[in-house]
């Protein structure tokens, strides 16, 4: 080599790899979702932003809520210069839990009754919809008929004044309604209930 001449050195950027994972808040992979992998040269822009966004949109349509997404938040959205390890990005999602107010399935005019085809989560119109089977599986209201008898210790009926002001010894039939709140996992369809409480006595 002639030391009096300029020496031209071609520098080739290292090839880097980035992996985007889709997990729940505990770090477990979201079922049925593959990692998104990409390769590129150090300092060059990441290339899978659209694919990551598309996957998030699909999962929201399945009933997931987006918790966080750090894709491209480091290195100004570029591949890093560390060939010793892959760049890792994490998209965290959780299954949406929707409150279901009590409704009376025997009352066709109850405004709380879900309707087939309506989104389970009203704020996610593209998400999973109510089905007849799912609606029928809900039990948030029940009616109990009870009979009250007024008797003495010797077993004889006690005379009392009924609601119309008349004297009576007849048994009284009373209907009590109980309701309980429900929560449904929009992704799995799993339903959890609260405690039964009486609406009237």
Predicted features along the sequence, with ranges:
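Acidic/polar residues at beta-strand termini and the immediately following turn/coil
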Residues: 24, 44, 152, 184-186, ...
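Structural motif
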Residues: 21-30, 148-160
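Conserved "repeat-terminator" motif of extracellular CCP/Sushi domains
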Residues: 1-22, 78-145, 149-151
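Mature extracytoplasmic or otherwise solvent-exposed domains
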Residues: 157-165, 183-185, 189-193, 197
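Solvent-exposed, conformationally flexible loop/turn segments
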Residues: 2-4, 38-49, 82-86, 117, ...
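Short, tandemly repeated low-complexity microdomains enriched for cysteine and small residues
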Residues: 30-40, 68-74, 102-107, 159-177
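Surface-exposed interfaces of beta-sheet-rich extracellular modules
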Residues: 1, 50-82, 191-201
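Hydrophobic alpha-helical segments, especially N-terminal targeting/anchoring helices
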Residues: 22-23, 39, 73, 113, ...
